[in-house]
Amino acid sequence: MSQNFDTEFVNTKMWDLFRKRFKSRTTEASYQSDIREFCRLSGKPFEETDSRDVKRYYETMKKRADAGEISGITLTKKFRELHSFASFLMEQESGEEAPGHDYFYPYLRNMVKESP
């Protein structure tokens, strides 16, 4: 797995800082896949997306979940990963957490949760 992320989707400096949190390449690959998918569907780099892009992505993924193409848990995982990356970017920009600017977080509150 490449250490670098596609420059068309994310700032590679930020990605390199973020990926240091991962304990495995599998985790890194999962985050890359979900971020790429979101960016491809939005047609924008991650840092240029807004609440409308997140809403469209949610609606698209929810339709896939309702059709049985992905599970509710998978949808939750995708949003948890996207939320994590968005939150990280906000922390880097402001020096503190700024969850009010994370467009993914509000969707997580109503998503399927994994069983303990």
Regions found by a protein language model. Give the residues of each.
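Short alpha-helical hairpin
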Residues: 1-15
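N-terminal core-binding DNA-recognition domain of tyrosine recombinases/integrases
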Residues: 13-116
